[in-house]
């Protein structure tokens, strides 16, 4: 992929416009990992000024020179891996990514693992909160990253949660209007950032005191599941941000267990079982 600029413009703005990225963050990530070449040289500074007529291109994926003699080991459960994608099961309590380069994160672990296999590109497609667990997908190719991240909201995503008490019905749909406040909390009703939230649910196991619920996202908004169950006066165990009165020793009883999307002419589903601690609570 090659393109040129018609005017003075930052590399970030040019890459975002020419490659169709929907956010600055995604375009910035691509530049910082060395996927963009300017006049034949890799440039990793998003603010670099590009003059009219300067040739910019997508760098070809190359094998890393640093290949471990022994097969690298990733200390996270690998759910799926091929030449383009790696999906792992993140444990509760681990940060997925940080600007602090000295901090161990899921990203640093996966990046080291991939470099050990000779893969230089490591792009994280989705995030899972530190207090939660579940599937995190990484792309080994820029084109795959862009395809997955641009369409993420359209894909079928399912979660397991544990709430105190139970539900009136064994299955159904939960729908309501929320708005995002100035500190990122979703609150009931309309506001500056209004959104419609819709979730399908099914009770998987319950003992009256605690209930394991499977959630399928119909809408796709950050923290929508947490906000919905807070509205129902049954916030997820350990979710102090949304007023849970119950502690959960591992963090929060929320697990992203399934993602399904079109891939290589078939429907790929990456999934995990119900976490054993969830079942133990509701037995």
Task: List where the protein language model places each region.
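RNA pseudouridine synthases
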Residues: 1-283
